[in-house]
A protein has these predicted regions:
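Conserved catalytic or regulatory cores that recognize and/or transform ribose-phosphate-containing ligands
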Residues: 1-130
């Protein structure tokens, strides 16, 4: 059976390791054996206690991050986008919103997980997200 890939889009910037990874680990650990969860964090080092810009241009430049995330979005079978209403007084995850836009343009199916009522009622989300 062919493997399927799910891109796990969600908050990263200024998140602790736990905030950025716990939900992704939970999803990956509960997927069928033929479904692989792809995390955008696999190449991004921590800076102190949080994820954020770094000095290694191979991994941390805006271009490198955008290229990796675009590649993952383009090559996955489905996007699972986690957009909590608020995470440590930060909202929304702008990178995730951009990845949702990429997925719409690529005609990828999108599953949105959120507690944000405004987001679930937004006409562009309602028209384009499963």
């Amino acid at each position: 059976m062919n493997k399927k890939y799910i891109y796990l889009a969600g908050p990263i910037a200024q998140c602790s390791y736990k905030e950025a990874n716990d939900w992704r680990d939970y999803v990956r650990n509960n997927l069928h054996e033929n479904i692989i969860g792809i995390s955008p964090l696999r190449c991004e080092p921590m800076h102190g206690e949080t994820y954020g810009p770094g000095n290694d241009s191979r991994y941390n430049s805006p271009g490198a991050i955008a290229a990796k995330n675009w590649y993952d979005t383009e090559h996955c079978n489905l996007i699972l986008a986690y957009l909590p209403r608020e995470l440590n007084e930060r909202r929304p995850s702008y990178g995730t919103v951009i990845e949702i836009g990429w997925a719409i343009g690529l005609r990828k199916p999108i599953i949105l997980v959120t507690d944000d009522e405004y987001l679930t009622e937004h006409p562009l989300i309602k028209a384009n997200v499963n």
